[in-house]
């Protein structure tokens, strides 16, 4: 869990490029104090001079993002919108800030990874004056991927071609939960994930009971070469190929997994196979405990009924 740093004015004079806000004593909860810091973070910053030192700007943005961890989400998004509105007056400055935001919120090494927070910076970078064609294309791809695969959003209804050549829509499938596995047949890490998931007793038990469906999607065409490569994939998985998914899905973390509910809403992503297996084990154990408790209560009810029936029988 990330800690929010509260900094005294004396410390700020020597450690920061400008004076950070100090929450009033009337704000006592962590969320309220964090929200105040986020809302007023840039109040004393000279927006012209801060960009003269990239090091100072990076450190300031690092602190800014760290305060967001416990802040109110509406306050956070409003603060980002106001910041972008101010910085966007200069195209080069906006591109610099978008680049730093990408490193701190979106990249593989991002300390505060957050798709929701990065998205407005990506949009601002894509529309900044002076942005190159290459930069704009890169931002637009990230925007498309993120907007279509945010947690809490409906997963795109892509067309799937199965091993037998039949074509279906992703949203055609019914079930309680879905594990979408974006597969690359020749990749070693993907192969290891397939082996672990296909041999996991907990997941297979949930599949058999109809609790979870695994949909394994290879981005690309469903040609004969693909069919040969996936011929030995688990028969209790829905194995498909789908074109155009690279534009729709965020696949920074590979192997890529998405976990959906029955309405095809994304519950989680950037999952790891080992963590999935542990989660499925816990779900299965929980279901077993519930089933055992129901059976115990049922047996107790039957015993009580038998006792009542015996008491109601007339004595000879």
Name each model-derived stretch:
Residues 191-231, 244-247:
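Structural microenvironment flanking redox-active thiols in thiol-disulfide oxidoreductases
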Residues 259-316:
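Thiol-/selenol-based redox modules, centered on thioredoxin-like
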Residues 181-184, 216-221, 241-244, 261-262, ...:
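Active-site proximal loops enriched in glycine and acidic residues that flank catalytic Cys/His/Asp
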Residues 166-198, 213-215:
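Short active-site neighborhood of thiol/selenol oxidoreductases, capturing the structured segment around
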Residues 68-70, 104-106, 185-189, 221, ...:
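Short acidic, S/G/P-rich loop/turn micro-motifs used as interaction or catalytic elements
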Residues 227-263:
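Short, internal strand/loop/helix patches
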Residues 97, 214-216, 259:
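Structural beta-sheet core signal
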Residues 1-166:
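Oxidative protein folding and maturation machinery
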